[in-house]
């Protein structure tokens, strides 16, 4: 118990604070610049590890980033399978306005292939929760979810970015965590926690809304969803029921938005 396997994207995140967002054809100057490793899979693995789960993480990066990414994950206590690919890693450009709202553009970069999942099969089999996102290819997620189903590992899907999902894959998912805009088409997944940003989240089966606490003004919402999912996975792997796990994930995400950027904003349990 308490094991989480994560499969997802790792890349370089470039943060720029701007006085306001662009209008059409406009160039504006950023007020600050910050660069760190990120990606939904990477951030969620870190969040689960900081919430005291035993985390295994499968990802792909460009060859130039393989060693520093492995070192960063090792420093977080994450058992990693970082596959080096030719070409660049993923990149994300993140603009943040004074209210903490963001605009994000992602270049997908190095991609996992379905066959990369096979060497990760023992980690999936040993996990209590397999955490997936739509940042990796559908065939990769389907291969991983099939291995999870064969070994009794529950699949948690963060369905971002939104895309249509085949019924064959959705049948393998136990729990999804869409936001209000990603929820369409996921009704046949057995359970969902619908994230509502500053308003908290909603457990679909019970209709119960769980408000998010406040730990101060929001300065940066980037990565709040990743924190929510990583902490939710860690709590579920520990044996907590869904409502209790969602309450804890809500609080962790609410705390994260009071700190700028992502890695330094992901809280440590305790």
Per-range role (PLM):
Residues 49-50, 149, 237:
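Gly/Ala-rich phosphate-binding loop of Rossmann-like dinucleotide-binding domains
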Residues 61-63, 161:
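Residues in the short beta-alpha loop(s) of Rossmann-like NAD(P)-binding domains
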Residues 184-270:
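Conserved phosphate-binding/catalytic region of the ribokinase-like
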């Amino acid at each position: 118990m308490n094991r989480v396997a994560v499969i997802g994207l790792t890349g370089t995140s470039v943060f720029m604070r701007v006085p306001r967002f662009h209008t059409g054809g406009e160039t504006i100057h950023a007020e600050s610049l910050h660069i760190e490793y990120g990606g939904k899979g990477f951030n969620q693995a870190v969040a689960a590890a900081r919430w005291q789960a035993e985390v295994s993480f499968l990802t792909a990066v460009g060859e130039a980033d393989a060693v520093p990414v492995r070192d960063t994950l090792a420093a977080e206590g994450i058992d990693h399978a970082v596959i080096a690919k030719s070409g660049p890693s993923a990149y994300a450009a993140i603009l943040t306005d004074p209210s903490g709202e963001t605009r994000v553009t992602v270049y997908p970069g190095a991609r996992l292939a379905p066959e990369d999942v096979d060497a990760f099969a023992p980690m999936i089999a040993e996990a209590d929760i397999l955490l997936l996102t739509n940042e990796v290819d559908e065939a990769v997620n389907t291969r991983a979810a099939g291995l999870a189903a064969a070994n009794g590992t529950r699949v948690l899907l963060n369905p971002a970015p939104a895309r249509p999902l085949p019924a064959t894959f959705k049948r393998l998912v136990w729990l999804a965590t869409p936001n209000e805009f990603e929820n369409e088409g996921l009704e046949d997944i057995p359970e969902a926690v619908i994230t509502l940003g500053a308003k908290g989240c909603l457990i679909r089966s019970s209709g119960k809304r769980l408000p998010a606490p406040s730990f101060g003004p929001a300065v940066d919402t980037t990565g709040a969803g990743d924190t929510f999912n990583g902490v939710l996975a860690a709590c579920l792997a520990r044996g907590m029921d869904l409502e209790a796990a969602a309450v804890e994930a809500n609080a962790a995400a609410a705390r994260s938005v009071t700190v700028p950027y992502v890695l330094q904003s992901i809280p440590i349990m305790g």
